[in-house]
Amino acid sequence: MAYSLWNDQIVEEGSITISPEDRGYQFGDGIYEVIKVYNGHMFTAQEHIDRFYASAEKIRLVIPYTKDVLHKLLHDLIEKNNLNTGHVYFQITRGTTSRNHIFPDASVPAVLTGNVKTGERSIENFEKGVKATLVEDVRWLRCDIKSLNLLGAVLAKQEASEKGCYEAILHRGDIITECSSANVYGIKDGKLYTHPANNYILNGITRQVILKCAAEINLPVIEEPMTKGDLLTMDEIIVSSVSSEVTPVIDVDGQQIGAGVPGEWTRKLQKAFEAKLPISINA
């Protein structure tokens, strides 16, 4: 039996009823997070929870629980489901009220939900690399907020899937931003390039870990926008997210990247990232 988070309770998944007038359902008026679980333990849990509260503040949504309470609820949800390896997803909406674009009265309670998903690490992708395609970035201008409004990303990801690609690498005009569900990096002449963390991208928690890994292996980081031309001439390309970890891209729209296999710096980053997993798990 599967269990879900329903506000401050862990309940049977099938017992939850969402109102058709929930603002998340009608407006996408809410935020979410996804945390990777290894061996029953959340990885970088505090960073994800901190970002959850930061996103809530940006959209003026009050979370009616402390960070410590939320952390305990997520821990209990994982334990109740006996989750070993996978993800825990949680979201909060601005609550249920008659449909109106204007915020509801402060007395309307927010609605917190969460669930878990079992899933092993994508070792084959890490080892062999994946294909990607370039797609115009048509999302809104507050990509730094982990909003429930994901239609632009959904359309891009679908386009990539239909082309037989793992990811859609997004660009606004000629400038590379990120992917439909990941951050993107290029490595050229021993330097790591990635878009700066501003409103055009989500400052991924995995991204933050990777930048620390780069410093540890003496790989200089340049946070500057890349052009499409820059990207296609990189020696190596990687994408990162909670599920992707450090995934090499070996082909973009049929153009081989580097030698067409995961590169030396990618392997070093993967090794440095992997080394952090037990550190966080035991923290």
UniProtKB/Swiss-Prot annotation:
Originating species: Lysinibacillus sphaericus (Bacillus sphaericus)
Keywords associated with the record: Aminotransferase, Pyridoxal phosphate, Transferase
Protein family according to the UniProt entry: Belongs to the class-IV pyridoxal-phosphate-dependent aminotransferase family.
Entries under SUPFAM superfamilies matching the protein: D-aminoacid aminotransferase-like PLP-dependent enzymes (SSF56752)
Annotated positions of the N6-(pyridoxal phosphate)lysine modification: 146
Top class in the EC scheme: transferase
Gene3D superfamilies to which the protein is assigned, alphabetical: 3.30.470.10, D-amino Acid Aminotransferase, subunit A, domain 2
Record has Transcription regulation as a keyword: no
UniProt-recorded name of the protein: D-alanine aminotransferase
GO cellular component labels: cytosol
Binding partners and assembly: Homodimer.
Function: Acts on the D-isomers of alanine, leucine, aspartate, glutamate, aminobutyrate, norvaline and asparagine. The enzyme transfers an amino group from a substrate D-amino acid to the pyridoxal phosphate cofactor to form pyridoxamine and an alpha-keto acid in the first half-reaction. The second half-reaction is the reverse of the first, transferring the amino group from the pyridoxamine to a second alpha-keto acid to form the product D-amino acid via a ping-pong mechanism. This is an important process in the formation of D-alanine and D-glutamate, which are essential bacterial cell wall components.
GO molecular function: D-alanine-2-oxoglutarate aminotransferase activity; pyridoxal phosphate binding
Cofactor: pyridoxal 5'-phosphate
Record EC number: 2.6.1.21
Binding site for substrate: 32, 99, 101
Binding site for pyridoxal 5'-phosphate: 51, 178
GO biological process: D-amino acid biosynthetic process; D-amino acid catabolic process
UniProt keyword Transferase, yes or no: yes
Domain of life: Bacteria
Catalytic residues identified in the record: 146
Reactions that this protein is recorded to catalyse: D-alanine + 2-oxoglutarate = D-glutamate + pyruvate
